[in-house]
Amino acid sequence: IADTGIGMTEADLVENLGTIAHSGTKKFMEALKQKQEGGADLIGQFGVGFYSSFMVADRVEVFTHSYEPEAASLRWSSDGREGYSIETLAEPLDRGTRIVIRLKDEYEEFSQEYRVKELLRRYSNFVGFPLNFNGEHVNTVQAIWSKSKSDVKPEEYDEFYQFIAHTDEKPLSYMHFS
């Protein structure tokens, strides 16, 4: 899993990955209140998704290089049981972050292309940014519930219904809730 975002410093790795679900209930509730007041999307902010990877992994490694000018390229590594380690890499990486999940033998199926695409579409189809797998765009439907009613076109309702219902039919009607 890779991005070309701002990357992380060693302090970021310790703060964000050093403690399981570090953000905690209080921060979650504050963010939820902000979301209800028109704030940011909550998907991906509380560590649960990242730490769930240890259910299927022997080891998870995070390779990262921050946008900060003097930042080092780093490797964070953990088996999910005995803490974690952070090391500075000799060879510099490009800015961004790459996560490598080393699967347990019994979860080898999750390395198959068809299975990864199926899981991405099932669980990440509505994230607010494009997802690509081996160069192919895989999340096809935008999260219409995150838009105001006036910003959603009728064909977007149709597409959403067709995706959810697994049909080519159009809905008889629709109602928008916010």
Indicate residue ranges for each PLM-predicted region.
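GHKL/Bergerat-fold ATPase module in large chromosome/replication-associated machines
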Residues: 42, 60-83, 104-108, 114-178
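GHKL (Bergerat-fold) ATPase N-terminal catalytic module, capturing the glycine-rich phosphate-binding loop
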Residues: 1-105, 109-110, 118
